[in-house]
């Protein structure tokens, strides 16, 4: 029987996501081995993610191990995968999307926090979304895996931290949290999606294609197409969300000025993936130049 070796980062969330993929592969009738590797981004826990200046800092190491033959596939959070990867590789499968919303892990919702409260996040998008709603709170950089961030929140006296609901669900965390309205806090492109990369044309790619969730894959590709079409980096303060409506796809795109001074929301409906290019053109034509994007 074929054994598929899947690589993952060693964090609890990354391993849990690999286990979800492994379960799907086993259900399809194949053996699985989970292999853990550490990345550069796991070592630098002080710099904000948006300041590291390296797209896919958690992804490149694992993907290189596919090409070297050390593993057959790599499990990633889809939002971490650069929009251009080695042409020998492909995203062969995605799991059904988890809850894509962000949430404030806190004793109180954002609207009830006292002025001057400190909220932790390393995401520029989340920073600006919070400050757009509450200019009287403070946002502090916080890095590390889920457990590290929760511990830092408590030890440093923060009022809360921002986390993806999918992470809270997958780790079955017993936390008090307040989901953000995705109409106002549009999540990062591909948030909540587990993706599996393998070598194009390989046996692993064939196996993985059999466990792919088609609707989630289409939403992922719509969000990635917009981001790639506009040449947006992973650190830009932008949220993009695609959702199937039964009559096509509804796409929300939230853009903040690079300095956080203003925000613009795009809300578009398309029949399918082939129409996404029209959204790219519309955003390019209507996003103010003073926002600082080079589209």
From Swiss-Prot:
Classification via InterPro entries: HemC, Porphobilin_deaminase_cofac_BS, Porphobilin_deaminase_N, Porphobilinogen_deaminase_C_sf
Keyword terms: Porphyrin biosynthesis, Transferase
Tell me its cofactors: dipyrromethane
Q: Which GO terms describe its biological process?
A: protoporphyrinogen IX biosynthetic process
UniProt xrefs under CDD domains = PBP2_HemC_archaea
| Listed GO CC annotations | cytoplasm
Recorded catalytic reaction(s): these are: 4 porphobilinogen + H2O = hydroxymethylbilane + 4 NH4(+)
Q: Function of this protein?
A: Tetrapolymerization of the monopyrrole PBG into the hydroxymethylbilane pre-uroporphyrinogen in several discrete steps.
Q: Which family does it belong to?
A: Belongs to the HMBS family.
Q: What is the name of the protein in this document?
A: Probable porphobilinogen deaminase
In its UniProt entry, the species of origin is given as Thermoplasma acidophilum (strain ATCC 25905 / DSM 1728 / JCM 9062 / NBRC 15155 / AMRC-C165)
Organism phylogeny: Archaea, Methanobacteriati, Thermoplasmatota, Thermoplasmata, Thermoplasmatales
């Amino acid at each position: 029987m074929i054994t598929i070796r899947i690589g993952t980062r060693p964090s609890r969330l990354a391993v849990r996501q690999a286990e979800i993929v492994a379960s799907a592969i086993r259900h399809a009738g194949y053996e699985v081995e989970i292999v853990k590797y550490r990345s550069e981004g796991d070592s630098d826990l002080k710099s904000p993610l948006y300041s590291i200046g390296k797209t896919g800092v958690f992804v490149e190491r694992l993907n290189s191990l596919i090409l070297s033959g050390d593993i057959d596939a790599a499990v990633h959070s889809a939002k971490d995968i650069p929009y251009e990867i080695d042409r020998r590789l492909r995203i062969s499968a995605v799991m059904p999307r988890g809850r894509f919303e962000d949430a404030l892990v806190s004793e109180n919702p954002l609207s009830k926090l006292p002025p001057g409260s400190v909220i932790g996040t390393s995401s520029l998008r989340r920073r600006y979304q919070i400050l757009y709603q509450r200019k009287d709170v403070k946002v502090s950089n916080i890095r590390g895996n889920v457990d590290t961030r929760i511990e830092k929140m408590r030890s440093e006296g923060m009022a809360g931290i921002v986390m993806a609901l999918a992470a809270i669900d997958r780790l079955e965390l017993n936390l008090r949290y307040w989901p953000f309205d995705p109409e106002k806090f549009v999540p990062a492109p591909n948030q909540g999606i587990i993706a599996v990369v393998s070598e194009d044309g390989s046996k692993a790619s064939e196996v993985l294609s059999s466990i792919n969730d088609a609707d989630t894959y289409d939403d992922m590709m719509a969000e990635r197409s917009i981001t790639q079409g506009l040449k947006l980096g992973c650190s830009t303060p932008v949220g993009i969300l695609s959702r199937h409506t039964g009559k096509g796809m509804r796409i929300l795109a939230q853009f903040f000025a690079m300095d956080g001074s203003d925000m613009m929301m795009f809300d578009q409906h398309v029949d399918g993936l082939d129409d996404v290019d029209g959204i790219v053109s519309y955003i390019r034509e209507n996003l103010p130049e003073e926002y600082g994007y080079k589209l």
